[in-house]
Amino acid sequence: MKLKLSISTCPNDTFMFDAMLHRRIDTEGLDFDLTMADIEQLNAAALAGEPDITKLSYASFPLVADRYRILGSGSALGRGNGPLLVSRHKLYPDELRDARIAIPGEHTTANRLLSLFFPEASDKRVYLFSDIADAVLSDECDAGVLIHEGRFTYRGKGLRLVADLGEEWEKRTSLPLPLGAIVVSRRLDEQLARTVERVLRRSVEYAFA
């Protein structure tokens, strides 16, 4: 049976889905029609109910909980690896009210954290996550929220840290930050959903072996 699978280009996703996509493991008769996209595109597709299985920002899950359920494998939960708010020029948190801020998507966990900790930051502009650093460097935006590899390379590009949103989450909650989930459509019957769960778990275990 062929299922529509949508994942991001993030190394986390390619790492854990490689085995099932390339049949390095038993997929129990499942085949996959793969789409790779930016996380905000994945969120939008899930909001439209399109994929059978998809990566999704945890911040978006309440919007699709009637159509999708979270699988027990594949979630990105972490400490010390959350989104970073950065700027080119010195910028204090109390100056964010008037700042133009690049974000990786309206429905991303990164944007939800920004809204939670800096509700006064209202001038938000959506960019592809990989273009955010350049938007700040070119002064198209005063600040930007970096995710994925951008959080590890920003200093080398001449950007400076304004706030570590993941660290702030951990300080306030003492919990790991829920970044992304793998969800399965409620269109799939219970038996098929359990098969997907087993295959994904097997793929993750293969990746770590």
Where are these predicted regions, by residue range?
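N-terminal hydrophobic or amphipathic helices and topogenic motifs
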Residues: M1-A76, S87, R100, E205-A209
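Bilobed "Venus flytrap"/periplasmic-binding protein-like clamshell domains
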Residues: K2-R23, G82-D142, E149
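General small-molecule cofactor/ligand-binding pocket signal
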Residues: D33-A37, K124-Y127, V162
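A structural signal for short, well-ordered beta-strand segments and their strand-loop junctions
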Residues: A46, K55, V126, G144-L146
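Short loop/helix-cap segments at secondary-structure boundaries that form the rim of catalytic
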Residues: L63-A65, L114, T153-G156
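Active-site regions of enzymes building and remodeling cell-envelope glycoconjugates
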Residues: Y68-G72, S122-D123, G158-V162
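Hydrophobic/proline-rich hinge and linker segments of small-molecule sensing/allosteric domains
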Residues: I70-P93, W169-R187
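Pocket-lining segment of extracytoplasmic ligand-binding domains
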Residues: L128-A209
